[in-house]
Amino acid sequence: MNTSAPRKFNHPDVTARGEARASVAFRQLETLWINTGTLCNIECANCYIHSSPTEDRLSYITAAEAAHFLDETAALALASGSGLPEIGFTGGEPFMNPDMLAMAEDGLARGHKVLILTNAMQPMLRPGIKQGLLALRERYDAALTLRVSLDHYTEALHDAERGAGSFAKTMEGLKWLADNGFSLAVAGRTTSGEGEEETKERSGYAALFAREGVALDSKDPSSLVLFPEMDEEAEVPEITTACWGILDVDPGAMMCATSRMVVKRKGMAAPVVVACTLLPDDPQFELGASLAESLGAVKLNHRHCAKFCVLGGASCSAS
């Protein structure tokens, strides 16, 4: 007789306990993420997307391919009567993609706010990239925001995650951005994300910013975004339809209610759309070749849905 317990996150509609699995209806497109590719200049100890200098399972997307989706966002905004969404670029390290500046300028020229997630290390600090960024800032000012990944406010813990010397290089990039008047945010990691521990972490970042002359308000959750750690082995509950009321959480506040991400898989002829930034590889979250195909409900059939979004309360957008 088979006595093994049902596996969690195994059925799109039903949890291991036989309860109805929660889903999130699409509300409106507020952020369109474009994954620039999984190649990165460093390899972090706990990278959720497993980027590295050799990891190219998500290929560089081109400016022409990105433009196709920007065209579609304009059509969707016109049809729905909503404003243009923010365009977010993530990787990998976006500044390794040779079309990064061109894609950012295309989005800005169309009237989008543009957010680029970066480690602010050598790919961003190359002279040509710096010159291009300065030109974009001069032309579009605060419509362009760069969010710098700084895992901890101490060099020791940041470098434990990202490698020796990474803290110093990231601080060089962060200070260059601050000194040149860019709209900035910082993304860090938190072990608990609540209460006294988060207050301590925000105070630590505040001291660092003050010491380095970086004008960021560490108390503002949009200026300093603290993400929960994403432990693949951690025990997490499945999210049922009853959980929204029990937890007093609005499904409309989940990332997948208001955002989608474009990825280009290695060897594929064209990009596809996935539900969110956290799940680029799971086939059940690949929603189609166009934005129009991708706007259905998303079933929360993954541990990241529970830990990172519903329970962690995280969002990747700038707002």
Tell what function each PLM region has.
Residues 80-88, 114, 140-147, 165-236:
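Conserved C-terminal portion of the radical SAM core fold
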Residues 209, 228-319:
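Accessory C-terminal segments flanking Radical SAM cores
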